[in-house]
């Protein structure tokens, strides 16, 4: 029996452009995503009966174990890799739930990486990616957590962008925001496009160029998310008034907001002040890559 451990980092949408609502009801998007140091932790005891235990500060919010995406990922893996070795998972849940940072998807991807490892399957194996797509649209990009552009409903991924590290503060006001509610508030009809600038890759991967790019390309889900959860507006305003902050944006469908700073010391200072002012919020200084 082996005991293997994998990080499941928060996925942050640096940009998020909603292009259209497709006839099947899904939304085509384009997004630059990066991954944070803040993470959940997934452990696998190989060859034990398939199961899952959830612990950690966000365990209660994660919901019933049977509904967890980790078990769905294991089931999908077993379908695509007949006779695969499985095992018992433990999820240490640290990230907030329904927060716009892909926690559940990253957990599932970490579980798939561990299953691939004990079954000697490469990360680029088509069976692994097929299993990831079955579990959820955000799972494929989390399999190899590096900054990329994701398109379609999340299934089309660029090569790693090699972005310079971005120093950030992640803030979640502990208000769960269901993604379906945000898209419902966005209000696109089937077949309808959303007007806006074309989504483009940064011209350069250096920090200054990326920051200039992010100023021009925002998150189309911010307005509807702020309607669903007005507390997001207060988080953004609080971060925007901090002198070290260079850009404030919501990630995904919310409610997590990130603020970018010039260096890790500035991020830590902002995080300390916000956490002191709002001790009930989840606040983490981090590096996005």
From Swiss-Prot:
EC number(s) on file = 2.7.1.148
* Binding residues annotated for ATP, in chain numbering: 96-106
Q: Where is the active site?
A: 11, 138
Q: Name one Pfam family in it.
A: GHMP_kinases_N
Class of the enzyme per the UniProt entry, highest EC level: transferase
Q: Decide whether keyword Transit peptide is in the record.
A: no
- PANTHER family (UniProt xref): 4-DIPHOSPHOCYTIDYL-2-C-METHYL-D-ERYTHRITOL KINASE, CHLOROPLASTIC
Q: Which HAMAP family match?
A: IspE (MF_00061)
Which family does the UniProt entry place this protein in? Belongs to the GHMP kinase family. IspE subfamily.
Q: What does this chain do?
A: Catalyzes the phosphorylation of the position 2 hydroxy group of 4-diphosphocytidyl-2C-methyl-D-erythritol.
Q: Any idea what this protein is called?
A: 4-diphosphocytidyl-2-C-methyl-D-erythritol kinase
Q: Name the species this protein comes from.
A: Azorhizobium caulinodans (strain ATCC 43989 / DSM 5975 / JCM 20966 / LMG 6465 / NBRC 14845 / NCIMB 13405 / ORS 571)
């Amino acid at each position: 029996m082996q005991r293997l451990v994998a990080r499941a980092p928060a996925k942050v949408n640096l940009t998020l452009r909603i292009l259209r609502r497709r006839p099947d009801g899904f939304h085509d998007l384009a997004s630059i995503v990066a991954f944070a140091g803040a993470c959940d932790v997934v452990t696998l005891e190989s060859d034990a009966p398939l199961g899952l235990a959830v612990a950690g500060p966000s365990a209660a919010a994660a919901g019933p174990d049977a509904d967890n995406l980790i078990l769905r990922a294991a089931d999908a893996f077993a379908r695509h890799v007949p006779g695969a070795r499985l095992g018992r998972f433990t999820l240490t849940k640290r990230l907030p739930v329904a927060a716009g940072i892909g926690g559940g998807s990253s957990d599932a991807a970490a579980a798939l990486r561990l299953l691939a490892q004990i079954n000697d399957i490469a990360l680029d194996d088509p069976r692994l990616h097929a299993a990831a797509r079955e579990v959820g649209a955000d799972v494929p990009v989390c399999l190899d957590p590096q900054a990329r552009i994701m398109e379609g409903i999340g299934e089309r991924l660029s090569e790693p962008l090699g972005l310079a590290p971005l120093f950030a503060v992640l803030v979640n006001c502990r208000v769960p925001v269901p993604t379906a509610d945000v898209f419902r508030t966005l209000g696109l009809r089937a077949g309808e496009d959303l007007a806006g600038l074309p989504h483009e890759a940064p011209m350069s991967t250096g920090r200054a160029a990326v920051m200039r790019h992010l100023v021009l390309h925002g998150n189309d889900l911010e307005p509807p998310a702020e309607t669903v959860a007005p507390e997001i507006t207060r988080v953004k305003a609080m971060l925007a008034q901090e002198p070290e902050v260079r850009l404030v944006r919501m990630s995904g469908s919310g409610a997590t907001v990130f603020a970018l700073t010039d260096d890790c010391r500035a991020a830590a200072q902002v995080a300390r002040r916000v956490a002191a002012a709002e001790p009930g919020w989840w606040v983490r200084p981090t590096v996005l890559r």
